[in-house]
């Protein structure tokens, strides 16, 4: 079943709205989106809507395969990105990279 909305931590809101963050890394349960799909975006903490995004692509990627390019698309350094992923998805190796644009 396709996701009908997506949430982000509030700390990422400005990066998303400014276009600095153009991907999100998710686990398998949050990977059910397709290119072209439009999703409302809300904050994880309070479920407050702040924009809509259009999905560009969804690709599997392993934690060990993450590069500086992925980190740049997340508007972070690679060590910061790995730390955030470990905090959100402890012990998870298989991730899904969802590319998007803000509408």
UniProtKB/Swiss-Prot annotation:
Active-site residues, record numbering mapped to chain: 21, 24, 74
InterPro entries given in the database record: AC4CH, ASCH_domain, PUA-like_sf
Alphabetized HAMAP family for the sequence: ac4C_amidohydr (MF_00684)
SMART domains assigned: ASCH
Free-text function comment from the UniProt entry: Catalyzes the hydrolysis of N(4)-acetylcytidine (ac4C).
Family the entry assigns: Belongs to the N(4)-acetylcytidine amidohydrolase family.
Domain ASCH: 7-93
Enzyme class: hydrolase
Lineage: Bacteria, Pseudomonadati, Pseudomonadota, Gammaproteobacteria, Alteromonadales
One Pfam match: ASCH
Protein name, as recorded: N(4)-acetylcytidine amidohydrolase
Organism: Shewanella sp. (strain W3-18-1)
